[in-house]
Curated annotation (Swiss-Prot):
ATP binds at R222, D223, E224, E490, G542, I543, D544, R545. Its EC number is 6.1.1.23. The gene is aspS. It is found in: Cytoplasm. GO terms for molecular function: aspartate-tRNA ligase activity; aspartate-tRNA(Asn) ligase activity; ATP binding; nucleic acid binding. Transmembrane segments: none annotated. It comes from Rickettsia felis (strain ATCC VR-1525 / URRWXCal2) (Rickettsia azadi). This is Aspartate--tRNA(Asp/Asn) ligase. Homodimer. InterPro entries: Aa-tRNA-synt_II, aa-tRNA-synth_II, aa-tRNA-synth_II/BPL/LPL, Asp-tRNA-ligase_1, Asp-tRNA-ligase_1_N, Asp/Asn-tRNA-synth_IIb, AspRS_core, GAD-like_sf. One of its GO terms (cellular component) is cytoplasm.
């Protein structure tokens, strides 16, 4: 018989009765009944009930003293449970093991929190004792699910003719939109490597190298703040690149992968392929966001022209100054109490707005509310037609400069969807957002900057760049840039790449980069493009966000084995930490006086 186990804790059945077995695992629960002691023994696979009787008094007493989470090996005989003790919630619930002997492999100290319930302990305690936290059923299953998802992704990608690669972790800095993690070079004092924010340049270089279909489960490193759906430090993405492809080729390749993944790992309804395509400008108008949650049926409408000549002075004067007005319908909300509308106004103010106008249309069509009296009957009918408002509905208004009004309307739409319980249940709704702006204005400098990936191909190519003479014209340029969105969560950005050096130099020059700067920062890729580069494009869906959705987790730390906390600290391994002076000297690093003072 094996030293530790003949079976795992999830496989013994009624057909195994009278077999002598050996099991090993953790003491999950212990119940003392005087002349009986029951222990639920847990391993990676499941739980089996062990019973100790007073026929072996010493063994039973020893078992009664076992602490939760101690590791034991039990030898015993399988017996059938009585009908009144059968537990159909467990695969092993029809049997139990009558213990003949047990060995304590490792005794557990007093636990800092309870393992055998899903009651949450303080996150700091959980992360400091992550090895215990990972024993809890929900988190343990999330990590298993993550492994299964990644394994299936590899199967799907190789089955579609993709080759898996590993690209360098120590590389050069690149402008991906976040701060780099820098690694000092011992051999080259004063110089630094950067951990890759994404394998962007390497995967494009592989296309130039003649490979056709690349993928990688790629670790990415960005020094950015934590969010519920973003872990500080590192994350993983399904990095994909393809040669000789159009935007639609990328879509038709990735859609079946997403559909297969989501239908395999959930019973919820999943959008049929092809997924809906929504141009960026349309998405910002209808949903007030470039990552719309299509489970929400509310569609925003532009009603600027209706208010341009209205008697509502505030909106009319705002429109004269270049503002717009967006209408956000609230289905079947007209009869709700005043407190609902006051709460929506308070929400808008908390989001930085001056307020939130609204109109209620009764079941008979009567218009009420603070804005209604300023519109003529014809304007009210036009409003109902434009915003698809029916009797019994209410409608809210957001007025500001175009971008601010769109974002406020989008937030109000989301809030209304939640407050009115409008979101379609038990489904995953996918869409593509296309035709992103190529450039944007940097909020800090007021200068032109790339809105997304600087390596995207501008629609219209070099000619479009040369014809754009003003800032306004540059901001109107669009890119072959796209996002895939599911239930309001951006899973990935992607693009058809700019593979022509002359277009790349021109695109960067518009953002204030000289040719020398471009050569210095992206010399390897520019040089490669001068030796025959295929048209290519790619995408990189986030593994962590996919797992979050499929695990129905609300926090990204619930699907990562060893995450950092919100302050980017590893409480288990005590990282980041100070290092010895010798190590700093080898790297030619000297700490500032203020840091040295804090160390003391």
């Amino acid at each position: 018989m094996h030293k530790y186990r003949t079976h795992n804790c999830n496989e013994l059945q009624i057909s195994d009765v009278r077999k002598e077995v050996k099991l090993s695992g953790w003491v999950h629960r212990r119940r003392d009944h005087g002349n009986l002691v029951f222990i639920d023994l847990r391993d990676h696979y499941g739980i089996t009930q062990i019973v100790f009787t007073d026929q072996n008094q010493q063994l039973m007493e020893d078992a009664s003293r076992l602490r939760y989470e101690s590791v034991i090996t039990v030898r015993g005989t399988i017996v059938a449970r009585s009908n009144d003790t059968i537990n159909d919630t467990l695969p092993t619930g029809h049997i139990e093991v009558l213990a003949g002997e047990f060995i304590v492999e490792s005794a557990a100290d007093t636990l800092p929190f309870v393992i055998n319930t899903e009651k949450d302990a303080p996150e700091e305690t959980r992360l400091k004792h992550r090895f215990l936290d990972l024993r809890r059923e929900k988190l343990h299953n999330n990590i298993i699910l993550r492994s299964q998802i990644i394994s299936h992704i590899r199967h799907l990608m190789t089955g579609r003719g993709f080759t898996e690669f590993q690209t360098p972790i120590l590389t050069a800095s690149s402008p991906e939109g976040a701060r780099d993690f820098l690694v000092p070079s011992r051999m080259h004092p004063g110089k630094f490597y950067a951990l890759p924010q994404a394998p962007q340049q390497f995967k494009q270089l592989l296309m130039v190298s003649g490979f056709d279909r690349y993928f990688q489960i790629a670790p990415c490193f960005r020094d950015e703040d934590a969010r519920a759906d973003r872990s500080p430090g590192e994350f993983y993405q399904l990095d994909v690149e393809m040669s000789f492809v159009t935007q639609e080729d990328i879509f038709s390749t990735i859609e079946p992968v997403m559909y297969d993944l989501f239908t395999k790992f959930t019973a919820k309804k999943v959008s049929e392929t092809p997924f809906v395509r929504i141009p960026y400008n349309e998405s910002m108008l209808k949903y007030g966001s470039d990552k719309p949650d299509l489970r929400n049926p509310i569609i925003i409408a532009d009603v600027t022209e209706i208010f341009r000549d209205s008697d509502f002075t505030i909106f009319r004067e705002n429109i004269k100054k270049g503002s717009i007005v967006r209408a956000i319908p609230a289905p079947k909300a007209a009869a709700l109490p005043r407190s609902f509308f006051d709460k929506m106004i308070e929400f808008a103010i908390s989001e930085g707005a001056g307020g939130l106008g609204y109109i209620q249309f009764s079941e008979t069509g009567e218009a009420k509310g603070p804005v209604a009296k300023f519109l003529s009957p014809q304007q009210l009918e036009s409003l109902k037609a434009t915003a698809s408002i029916s009797n019994g509905d209410a409608v809210f208004f957001a007025s500001d400069k175009k971008e601010k009004a769109a974002k406020l309307a989008g937030k109000v739409r989301i809030r209304l969807g939640e407050e009115l319980d409008l979101l379609e249940k038990d489904c995953f709704k996918f869409c593509w957002i296309t035709d992103f702006p190529f450039y944007e204005l940097n909020e800090d400098t007021g200068k032109i900057d790339f809105s997304h990936n600087p390596f995207s191909m501008p629609q219209g190519g070099l000619e479009a760049l040369e014809q754009a003479k003003t800032t306004e014209e540059l901001l109107e340029l669009t890119a072959y840039q796209y996002d895939i969105v599911c239930n309001g969560i951006e899973l990935s950005s992607g693009a058809i790449r700019n593979h022509k050096p002359e277009i790349m130099y021109k695109a960067f020059s518009m953002a204030g980069y000289s040719e020398e700067e471009v050569d210095k920062r992206f010399g390897g890729m520019i040089r490669a493009f001068k030796f025959g580069a295929p048209p290519h494009g790619g995408i990189a869906p986030g593994i962590d966000r996919i797992v979050m959705l499929l695990a129905e987790a609300t926090n990204i730390r619930e699907i990562i084995a060893f995450p950092l906390n919100q302050q980017a600290e590893d409480l288990l391994m005590n990282a980041p930490s100070y290092v010895e002076d010798k190590a700093l000297k080898e790297l030619s690093i000297m700490l500032s006086p203020s840091i040295l003072k804090n160390m003391k």
